[in-house]
């Protein structure tokens, strides 16, 4: 019996919505990355984009464990000499685009390459509770129920 390999035309993508309020960033990002890649499906094929479309709401209400909220530092470089920049998780979450913390966490858990970039386009993260994807009829995924460590009460 030959190993099953799914073809791109056979892929069935579902829409999933996750409420990120009170959820731990890394644990949530891990679940989202698995959904984006399609590893939760029995038909998973490493070279095919067979993951689901994931919508995340309330991304500004995610939590960190320990002192990561104030101590975790995100670095980037401007390209100019001495152009290293940094921001803490607290500064980003309290800033203009708090959803970027979760986007960056998921991005770092997805393979870096053409397929990973295509899979990241199936992720939509919103800071508030409103999203423009009601027409897709997304199915709610309750991450808090999967494991009690996924939720952190402040």
UniProtKB/Swiss-Prot annotation:
Disulfide bond among keywords: no
Any one GO MF annotation of this record: mRNA binding
Pfam families membership: Ribosomal_L13
GO CC, alphabetical: cytosolic large ribosomal subunit
Coiled coil: none
Keywords for the protein's UniProt record, in alphabetical order: Ribonucleoprotein, Ribosomal protein
InterPro entries membership: Ribosomal_uL13 (IPR005822), Ribosomal_uL13_bac-type (IPR005823), Ribosomal_uL13_sf (IPR036899)
Record-annotated disulphide pairs: none
GO biological-process terms attached to the record: negative regulation of translation; translation
Family label: Belongs to the universal ribosomal protein uL13 family.
Quaternary data: Part of the 50S ribosomal subunit.
Function of the molecule: This protein is one of the early assembly proteins of the 50S ribosomal subunit, although it is not seen to bind rRNA by itself. It is important during the early stages of 50S assembly.
Protein name per UniProt: Large ribosomal subunit protein uL13
Provenance organism: Rhizobium leguminosarum bv. trifolii (strain WSM2304)
Annotated gene: rplM
């Amino acid at each position: 019996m030959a190993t099953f390999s799914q073809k791109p035309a056979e892929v069935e993508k579902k829409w999933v919505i996750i409420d990120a309020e009170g959820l731990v960033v890394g644990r949530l990002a891990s679940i989202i990355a698995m959904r984006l890649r399609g590893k939760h499906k029995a038909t998973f094929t490493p070279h095919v984009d067979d993951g689901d479309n994931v919508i995340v709401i309330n991304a500004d209400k995610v939590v960190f464990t320990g002192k990561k909220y104030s101590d975790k530092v995100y670095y980037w470089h401007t390209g100019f000499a001495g152009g290293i920049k940094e921001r803490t998780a607290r500064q980003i979450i309290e800033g203009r685009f708090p959803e970027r913390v979760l986007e960056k966490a998921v991005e770092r858990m997805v393979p870096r390459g053409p397929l990973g970039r295509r899979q990241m386009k199936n992720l939509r993260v919103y800071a508030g509770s409103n999203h423009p994807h009601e027409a897709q009829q997304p199915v709610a995924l309750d991450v808090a129920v999967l494991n009690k460590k996924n939720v952190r009460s402040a």
